[in-house]
Amino acid sequence: MSGFHNVGNINMMAQQQMQQNRIKISVRNWQNATMNDLINFISRNARVAVYDAHVEGPLVIGYVNSKAEAESLMKWNGVRFAGSNLKFELLDNNGASAGTSDTISFLRGVLLKRYDPQTKLLNLGALHSDPELIQKGVFSSISTQSKMFPAMMKLASTEKSLIVESVNLADNQLKDISAISTLAQTFPNLKNLCLANNQIFRFRSLEVWKNKFKDLRELLMTNNPITTDKLYRTEMLRLFPKLVVLDNVIVRDEQKLQTVYSLPMKIQQFFFENDALGQSSTDFATNFLNLWDNNREQLLNLYSPQSQFSVSVDSTIPPSTVTDSDQTPAFGYYMSSSRNISKVSSEKSIQQRLSIGQESINSIFKTLPKTKHHLQEQPNEYSMETISYPQINGFVITLHGFFEETGKPELESNKKTGKNNYQKNRRYNHGYNSTSNNKLSKKSFDRTWVIVPMNNSVIIASDLLTVRAYSTGAWKTASIAIAQPPQQQASVLPQVASMNPNITTPPQPQPSVVPGGMSIPGAPQGAMVMAPTLQLPPDVQSRLNPVQLELLNKLHLETKLNAEYTFMLAEQSNWNYEVAIKGFQSSMNGIPREAFVQF
């Protein structure tokens, strides 16, 4: 018995030793395929097994058995995979590149010390005389010196507490901007930049920033040789199209500049070429999404034998600064069907992934996850544009928004891989967690339908679905917090158009019937009797459905808020009565007197 016990101990010690010898690695630029494809690719080509693989943001993290295997894997840096060049890195146990944790912490500390949140100024002036940087040996060699600024900018781009509008780079012995060129990628919306007291002498060295700082208002270049050139002012105006102040001198009329660069119309959540198209498109979208979420087969009668459908995955991860964005999206259920032609290189695959006709379209419908849209409950989370298409006597609807994945597909296309193929790749496929890339989550989407009216119904000639990582809509305006103190509220209110009709919900669909027996419930008939003290602008009232008008009336009578504040309260609560009342009750002490009806 003791012999068996000793053998067990030896095996356990051997396993522990293997665990201790494992090397943690990461892989970048893999998102155009599934993690399973990546692990199999590595095992087939590099002959290295990756264990316990999982996704962390843009990285696949895993382990290899030894340092020798890790070094072997590093030789594959730059290898092409799914249209991108893979990048392998060695990591320590905390996920940071080996030997870099201390440096990252140090540079992060330097950034935070030099940032003023009051003025939103990042002061990177006179870095060569900074005692901390000198002691750390940052300037001990050209190599470390050249890497410092890009590393600082990479850290700054991920540091959410840094909201930078101005950067000072004075007194840094700069002869050109090659060492600081990444500033434009990190802070593209920079408004003020100081490069004074350097040694910049060529316009050509600034060309890399041409049209990069599109909001740069003020530039300070004093005490640089370049300022003595007779073309200096002309070149600076050419490089920076919105520059107003150069070396403390006004060089452009700011009001005229704003007129030139302002759009002829404000960004709108909903745009319809005419009222008729607006009604038709909202009817269609509401009805379509309802059946898409509940019974997709009933949609098939909307497609003709020539109709086309395709799905495309945009695997780009939103910037970390975007509120509520998904930094670890999973697209496993979509990848095998994705027709993103910027990622799919095979002409055969591009053709195969275009579904034509009802049977083919139905097949791909079944491979997509079950969903739930919230167009009616949360209309502010969606944006729609509709334009006519005279060539086919039809129109084009484009809808942006989000959906929740509520269930696995009826048919999982990523399980079509044959048994033999699985066995072939199994040897080097250790540690792959297939569920991580197939998790159900919230997704953003863009969907474009080309609609052709026909025989008192419609036909979908083309249907294109693009799936993206979830992020808030760009059309959404900043919420106005009712709970703000009166003195703060006064400074915010003038910026808000009084119940802007352009940011309201789409009109509620009226009764209509389309192919397949789909019908859209209409709104109650008869005019809503509003409280005499609830005076809504006609253009606003005309865009609200009876349910919303009833909610406004009910909130107005209950809270005694005036029309503007009642509308704001309803909109901020996503037209949910219970949420609105709770919000009102918790914010009563902060609501200004003028927000209430004056009797």
Swiss-Prot record:
The keyword Nucleus applies. InterPro entries: Leu-rich_rpt, LRR_dom_sf, Mex67_RRM, NTF2-like_dom_sf, NTF2_dom, Nuclear_transport_factor_2_euk, NXF_fam, TAP_C_dom. Its main location: nucleus. It is found in: Nucleus; Cytoplasm. Keywords: Acetylation, Cytoplasm, Leucine-rich repeat, mRNA transport, Nucleus, Repeat, Transport. Residues 224-262 form the LRRCT domain. The modification N-acetylserine is found at S2. It holds the Pfam family LRR_NXF1-5. The keyword Transport applies. SMART domains: TAP_C (SM00804). One of its GO terms (molecular function) is tRNA binding. One of its GO terms (biological process) is tRNA export from nucleus. Residues 546-599 form the TAP-C domain. LRR repeats lie at residues 163-184, 189-210. Residues 280-467 form the NTF2 domain. GO terms for cellular component: cytoplasm; nuclear pore; nuclear RNA export factor complex; nucleus. Belongs to the NXF family. The leucine-rich repeats and the NTF2-domain are essential for the export of mRNA from the nucleus. The NTF2 domain heterodimerizes with MTR2. The formation of this heterodimer is essential for mRNA export and binds to all of the nucleoporin-FG-repeats. Involved in the export of mRNA from the nucleus to the cytoplasm. Present with 2830 molecules/cell in log phase SD medium. This is mRNA export factor MEX67. It comes from Saccharomyces cerevisiae (strain ATCC 204508 / S288c) (Baker's yeast). The gene is MEX67.
